[in-house]
Every structure is written in C-alpha cells, then in structure tokens.
C-alpha cells in the first residue's frame, strides 16, 4: 500500500513537471529587447520607404536612412536575434588556405537546454518571412511605376533580408544544400501553422550542431 502511494506521488510530480514545461513554452516573451529589435529595424525601413515622399523631398536623405535601417536589421538579425530567439546562427569563415566556408549552427536538443517560447519563435519566423515578401512587392510596384531611382534601394532590401532568411532556413534544415526542395513546405508551415516549441531551443556557446559548406 505504501509503495502504491509513492508511485502515485511520482506520477503526479512527473505530470506537474510536464505542465510546467508546457506553460513555460507558451509563456510570454522572455527576450523583449531582442524581440523588439528583431522587428523594429525592418519595419522602420519599410515605413520610412513608404512615407519618404510625404515627409521629405530629399532622395539622398531617404535613401541613406532606409539603407542604414536595412543594414542595422541585417546585423541584428544575423548576430543577435536569431541566436537569442530560436538558437540558430550562421556565418562565414575563411580557412588557412583562403577558402570560404559557410557555417550553419543550431542548438542541440538536450535535457538541460531551455526551449524558446512559442511567441518568440513565431515572431522570429513571421518577421523573417513576411518582410522580404513586402520588398518583393515594392520591387514590382517600383518597376511598373517607372520609379527607377528607387530600384537599387529595393534590390538592396530584398538582398539583405533574403540573405538572412536563406541562412536561417539552412540552419533549421541542418545545412541541407538542396534548399529548393524544402523551402516551400517550410515557409507554408511557418506562416499558416503554429510553430512547434520543441524545435526552437535557447542558444548558447556549447552544444551547437555545426554544418559547413
């Protein structure tokens, strides 16, 4: 009888732990500053680009401002927010022979690692996917309206944000070089379905799974 009570207590404790982990993953944002800047620079670049003609007649000033915001967004997403929000990181390395290698790192799942929250993962991927699509719309609208002076800026926006999207998809897919076969399904699942919290792990400098190309 005593052993049965002990077993019941252990089962209840185990379920309680699972409920705590589930509640944590569904908790509110744990990295508010990183989440804010993940969206701030890219949204600010879009808003500035759209409203430039309304608030300023200086093409050069608008061009420099939008390009600065795009550059800050590229750096912060590549070096900070991806590592903090979803535990992914990509970068380039030059070896001793002078050859360039692209490194794609993803935090390994371990019992000691803490998963990122669903809200952070969802914000990260949606912001990463939707904003380049908006710049693609700007590309066609600029082309068809013959505002060719803005075309270089729009191409820069597409290039910088698509580079981060491409790099993080490769991180997520384990550095799979055949990116064409997996991109479409990944994007559709990210946009239209709830992100799986177990897929996104808190970053760290240890236990990283590294893929080189």
Swiss-Prot record:
The keyword Transmembrane helix applies. GO terms for cellular component: Golgi membrane. It is a multi-pass membrane protein. InterPro entries: TVP23-like (IPR008564). It holds the Pfam family DUF846. One of its GO terms (biological process) is protein secretion. The chain crosses the membrane at residues 32-52, 54-74, 123-143, 150-170. It is found in: Membrane. It comes from the Eukaryota. Keywords: Membrane, Transmembrane, Transmembrane helix. PANTHER family: GOLGI APPARATUS MEMBRANE PROTEIN TVP23 (PTHR13019), GOLGI APPARATUS MEMBRANE PROTEIN TVP23 HOMOLOG A (PTHR13019:SF18). Belongs to the TVP23 family. This is Golgi apparatus membrane protein TVP23 homolog A. It comes from Homo sapiens.
């Amino acid at each position: 009888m005593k052993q049965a009570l002990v077993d019941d207590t252990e089962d209840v404790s185990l379920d309680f732990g699972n409920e705590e982990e589930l509640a944590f993953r569904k908790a509110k944002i744990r990295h508010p500053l990183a989440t804010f800047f993940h969206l701030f620079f890219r949204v600010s670049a879009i808003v500035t680009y759209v409203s430039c003609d309304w608030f300023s007649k200086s093409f050069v000033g608008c061009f420099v401002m939008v390009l600065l915001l795009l550059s800050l967004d590229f750096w912060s997403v590549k070096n900070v927010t991806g590592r903090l929000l979803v535990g992914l990181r990509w970068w380039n390395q030059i070896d001793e022979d002078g050859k360039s290698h692209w490194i794609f790192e993803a935090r390994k799942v371990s019992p000691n690692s803490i998963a990122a929250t669903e809200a952070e993962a969802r914000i990260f991927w949606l912001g990463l996917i939707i904003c380049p699509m908006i710049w693609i719309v700007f590309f066609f609208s600029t082309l068809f309206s013959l505002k060719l002076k803005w075309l270089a800026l729009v191409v820069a926006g597409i290039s910088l944000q698509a580079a981060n999207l491409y790099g993080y998809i490769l991180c997520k897919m384990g550095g799979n070089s055949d990116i064409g076969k997996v991109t479409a399904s990944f994007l559709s699942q990210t946009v239209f379905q709830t992100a799986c919290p177990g897929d996104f792990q808190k970053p760290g400098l240890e236990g990283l799974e590294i893929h080189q190309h």
